[in-house]
């Protein structure tokens, strides 16, 4: 009896490597919401896959699947089992492996989104893992958040300040937050958003396209 024949693994047909976009930020800031909106806003033009990080569950993967952000096979949940920061920075091997596995499944992916687990303002992505980093904070944390600094706020490629609609409810002054953000980030860009209302999502997409050279 002849041995079964299997199709050779698919090979990438596109010239440029996939763009890896890391999305970080504190718990509840809106990382998963941003990822959902980016997938829905870009999936018609680009081949997308997404990787989510949680400590003990795959809850964010489940939420994105239920929301219909992408087909289920294109969303991979990673259980880090420890500090979320470690899994994206000091020892990113679990996420690097996840990226590799997704690219075996979808070799022509244009963008790999990697959402970190909720962490503090010191969280950053390893350059081995992410080409672009987006850091999400929210107005509900108070107008003081931008001036607290930390690598996520000062060094990320794009800072997203989410939940601007809550400013009157928490006594936050958006002009003060914007001014403090410019002081902390210098020329680095930021976007004020209300992601649930899709306010600011187009600006984030434009940033990814321009900075990631997707429009060339």
Curated annotation (Swiss-Prot):
It is found in: Cytoplasm. One of its GO terms (biological process) is urea catabolic process. One of its GO terms (molecular function) is GTPase activity. The keyword GTP-binding applies. Keywords: Chaperone, Cytoplasm, GTP-binding, Nickel insertion, Nucleotide-binding. GO terms for cellular component: cytoplasm. Disulfide bonds: none annotated. GTP binds at residues 25-32. Belongs to the SIMIBI class G3E GTPase family. UreG subfamily. Facilitates the functional incorporation of the urease nickel metallocenter. This process requires GTP hydrolysis, probably effectuated by UreG. NCBIfam families: ureG. Homodimer. UreD, UreF and UreG form a complex that acts as a GTP-hydrolysis-dependent molecular chaperone, activating the urease apoprotein by helping to assemble the nickel containing metallocenter of UreC. The UreE protein probably delivers the nickel. This is Urease accessory protein UreG. It comes from Burkholderia pseudomallei (strain 1710b). The lineage of its organism: Bacteria, Pseudomonadati, Pseudomonadota, Betaproteobacteria, Burkholderiales.
């Amino acid at each position: 009896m002849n041995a079964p024949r299997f199709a050779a693994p698919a090979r990438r047909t596109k010239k440029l490597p996939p763009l890896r976009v890391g999305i970080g930020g504190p718990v509840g800031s809106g990382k998963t919401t941003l990822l959902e909106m980016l997938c829905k806003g870009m999936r018609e033009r680009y081949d997308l896959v997404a990787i989510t990080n949680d400590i003990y569950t795959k809850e964010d993967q489940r939420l994105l699947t239920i929301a219909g952000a992408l087909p289920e096979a294109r969303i991979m949940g990673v259980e880090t089992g420890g500090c979320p920061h470690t899994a994206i920075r000091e020892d990113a091997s679990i996420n690097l492996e996840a990226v590799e596995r997704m690219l075996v499944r979808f070799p022509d992916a244009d963008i790999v989104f990697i959402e970190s687990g909720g962490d503090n303002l010191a969280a950053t992505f390893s350059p081995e893992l992410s080409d672009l980093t987006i850091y999400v904070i929210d107005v509900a944390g108070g107008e003081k958040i931008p001036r607290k600094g930390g690598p996520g706020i000062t060094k990320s490629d794009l800072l997203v300040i989410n939940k601007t609609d809550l400013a009157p409810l928490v006594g936050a002054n958006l002009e003060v937050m914007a001014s403090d953000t410019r002081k902390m980030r210098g020329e680095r860009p930021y976007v004020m958003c209300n992601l649930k209302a899709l306010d600011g999502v187009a600006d984030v997409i434009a940033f990814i396209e321009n900075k990631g050279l997707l429009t060339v």
